[in-house]
């Protein structure tokens, strides 16, 4: 997109690559108990098994879909108008909110009145902000603790189940071997859940709306869903649900435009970003955020201290509670779903970082540390935490309690500063829960593999099982340019141990601002890590997709292999580098082993030989060995023969 502001406002359009359905996929909707609960999923169509392999039908599989209306050909996408307000009716029906006469943030009013920002502003439908009525609490946690199952909770239950039961039933009716096929495709290894809900190897265990309600009421899961972001499709973050991933986007003082950030958001959700954080620190933060929220079907998070710092020209010591409070209200009225707030960075912890290799690496943490030292006072975020809770519950903004003292190197992992802050975050969680405000806890950082589980165990203990949300962790410091891999290793491990959401790392980590390609690379890496964690935990149905892809691979259904994978485009591109012809898409080999050494083709030959001889596969292998032994002796018992 052109960075010219007038062009952006007048002619902004969505990136065409972000709206095309993925190959052999279509958007389907599952309706809940009322017509306006329509839960999106991605249906991946599969080819029939070739006759030589049995000839059965392979029904579609269903996968979790974060792309919103963008990949629905029936949806009219116009980013100048924004997305439909999916949750508006549910919010209004609860009767506990009020529409304000206008913005109540001083900064928001100033931006709205500034003619210099007119060409930058989101031009779509203008809705006055909504807030809880006096004395009311509008958080999903509050409803859950009242025993209320909201439409959001029902939506989430349907979404988490991914039509597993329907898929298994379709397998059973696929032919004479349907029951056997269903048993095979639904098979799943028992997991090790480390104290999370034990589903065993039951692929059909169902996530119910009541289960969702109970997890939210206990504080073990959150539903980030600001009442001013009705465009969002409800999702849940908790260790007893699918592991989620977050994608960071945002401009900087030196690069990127509003249009580029909207593009990154739509690109991130296409590939599986469950939430997106706008970490903009450059120009027009307010306007950039409005464009992103109005066009985002996933929850949006921010770090409000970044914008507050811009309001005081980058001087941390000039920050005040009043400026920060106004920033919270400004962003809550725009519709931000969760705030990273570094309230655990206390004055007493700052000296503990003096002997670190890399000091304080969190931007938010360093801002608050500098403020504490400049004033030699306790952090205003800590001192005013109860007042922050009052703001959060008026809009249903969730806390993401920031790890401002996270280790920025392997050397600093699990040190006194990091763990001291974590204990404080546990104390703040209890305060937030008194207000029925939803909380997740942010975690490291750079941690070697042998120390990762300790991080998880301490967080579960000190923070009373509030969802953990971690950046990686990176398991080594030696690979600039590959930190999506160094962190993906740690992410898979900590996700298995109980982390509920993983914040992606791109190849540009520590090096520069990521572009769209970097965003995709980070997303795919972290989708892989999250899925590996789901498998290891034994989450219901986690293995269905693996089984479907493995069956397609064994039957040489190349197109299905590509399409079931996390990145069909890259899989197809790699295959076609060496075997580009269409005929190669039905060949019983790839370029790795060629036609004579494909292990799966050899296995198929053994099975075919066994069927012809009327013997078991083991006996067939034995007979085959005997035949080859005779041939070997007849040819002179030489290992090599001159051609």
Swiss-Prot record:
Gene3D superfamilies: 6.10.250.620, Radical SAM ThiC family, central domain. Zn(2+) binds at residues 446, 510. Its cofactor is [4Fe-4S] cluster. Substrate binds at residues 248, 277, 306, 342, 362-364, 403-406, 442, 469. It catalyses: 5-amino-1-(5-phospho-beta-D-ribosyl)imidazole + S-adenosyl-L-methionine = 4-amino-2-methyl-5-(phosphooxymethyl)pyrimidine + CO + 5'-deoxyadenosine + formate + L-methionine + 3 H(+). Pathway: Cofactor biosynthesis; thiamine diphosphate biosynthesis. Keywords: 4Fe-4S, Iron, Iron-sulfur, Lyase, Metal-binding, S-adenosyl-L-methionine, Thiamine biosynthesis, Zinc. It comes from the Bacteria. GO terms for molecular function: 4 iron, 4 sulfur cluster binding; carbon-carbon lyase activity; zinc ion binding. PANTHER family: PHOSPHOMETHYLPYRIMIDINE SYNTHASE, CHLOROPLASTIC, THIAMINE BIOSYNTHESIS PROTEIN THIC. Homodimer. Catalyzes the synthesis of the hydroxymethylpyrimidine phosphate (HMP-P) moiety of thiamine from aminoimidazole ribotide (AIR) in a radical S-adenosyl-L-methionine (SAM)-dependent reaction. This is Phosphomethylpyrimidine synthase. The lineage of its organism: Bacteria, Pseudomonadati, Pseudomonadota, Betaproteobacteria, Burkholderiales.
């Amino acid at each position: 997109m052109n960075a010219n502001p007038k062009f952006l406002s007048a002619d902004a359009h969505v990136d065409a690559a972000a709206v095309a359905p993925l190959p052999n996929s279509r958007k389907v909707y599952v309706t809940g108990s009322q017509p306006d609960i329509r839960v999106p999923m991605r249906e991946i169509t599969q080819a029939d098994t070739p006759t030589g392999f049995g000839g059965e039908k392979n029904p579609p599989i269903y996968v979790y879909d974060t792309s919103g209306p963008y990949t629905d050909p029936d949806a009219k996408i116009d980013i100048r108008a924004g997305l439909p307000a999916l949750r508006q009716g549910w919010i209004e029906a609860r009767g506990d909110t009020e529409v304000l006469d206008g913005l109540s943030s001083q900064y928001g009013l100033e931006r709205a009145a500034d003619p210099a920002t007119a060409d930058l502003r989101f031009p779509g439908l203008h809705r006055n902000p909504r807030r809880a009525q006096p004395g009311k609490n509008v958080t999903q946690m509050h409803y859950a603790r009242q025993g209320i199952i909201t439409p959001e909770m029902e939506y989430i239950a349907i979404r988490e189940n991914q039509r597993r039961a329907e898929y298994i039933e379709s397998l059973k009716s696929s032919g004479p071997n349907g029951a056997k096929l269903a048993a095979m495709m639904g098979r799943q290894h028992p997991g090790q859940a480390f104290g999370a809900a034990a589903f065993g190897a039951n692929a059909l265990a169902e996530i119910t709306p009541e289960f969702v309600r109970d997890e939210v009421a206990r504080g073990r899961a959150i539903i980030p869903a600001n009442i001013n972001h009705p465009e969002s499709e409800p999702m849940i973050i908790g260790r007893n649900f699918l592991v989620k991933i977050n994608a960071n986007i945002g401009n900087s003082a030196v690069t990127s435009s509003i249009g580029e950030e909207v593009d990154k958001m739509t690109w991130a959700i296409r590939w599986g970003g469950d939430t997106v954080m706008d970490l903009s620190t450059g120009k027009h933060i307010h306007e950039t955020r409005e464009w992103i929220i109005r066009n985002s079907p996933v929850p949006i998070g921010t770090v409000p201290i970044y914008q507050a710092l811009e309001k005081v020209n980058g001087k941390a010591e000039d920050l005040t509670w009043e400026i920060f409070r106004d920033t919270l209200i400004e962003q809550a009225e725009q519709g931000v779903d969760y705030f990273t707030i570094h309230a655990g960075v206390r004055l007493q912890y700052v000296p503990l970082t003096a002997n670190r290799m890399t000091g304080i690496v969190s931007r938010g943490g360093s801002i608050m540390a500098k403020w504490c030292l400049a004033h030699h006072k306790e952090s205003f975020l800590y001192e005013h935490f109860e007042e922050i809770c009052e703001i959060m519950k008026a809009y249903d903004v969730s806390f993401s309690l920031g790890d401002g003292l996270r280790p920025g190197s392997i050397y600093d992992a699990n040190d006194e500063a990091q763990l001291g802050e974590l204990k404080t975050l546990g104390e703040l969680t209890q305060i937030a829960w008194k207000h029925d405000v939803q909380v997740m806890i942010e975690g490291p950082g750079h941690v070697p593999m042998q120390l990762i589980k300790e991080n998880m165990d301490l967080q579960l203990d000190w923070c009373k099982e509030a969802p953990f949300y971690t950046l990686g962790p990176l398991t080594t410091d030696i690979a600039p340019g590959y930190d999506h891999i160094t962190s993906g290793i740690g992410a898979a491990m900590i996700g298995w141990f109980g982390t509920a959401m993983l914040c992606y790392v791109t190849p540009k980590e520590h090096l520069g601002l990521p572009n769209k390609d970097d965003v995709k690379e980070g997303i795919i890496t972290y989708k892989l890590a999250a899925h590996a964690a789901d498998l290891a935990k034994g989450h219901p149905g986690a293995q269905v997709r693996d089984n479907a892809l493995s069956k397609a691979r064994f039957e040489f259904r190349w197109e299905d292999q590509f399409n079931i994978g996390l990145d069909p485009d890259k899989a197809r591109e790699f295959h076609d580098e060496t075997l580009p012809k269409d005929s190669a898409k039905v060949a019983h080999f790839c370029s790795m082993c060629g036609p004579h050494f494909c292990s799966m083709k050899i296995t198929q030959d053994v099975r075919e030989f066994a069927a012809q001889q009327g013997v078991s596969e083991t006996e067939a292998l034995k007979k085959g060995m005997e035949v080859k032994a005779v041939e070997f002796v007849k040819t002179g018992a030489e290992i090599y023969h001159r051609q």
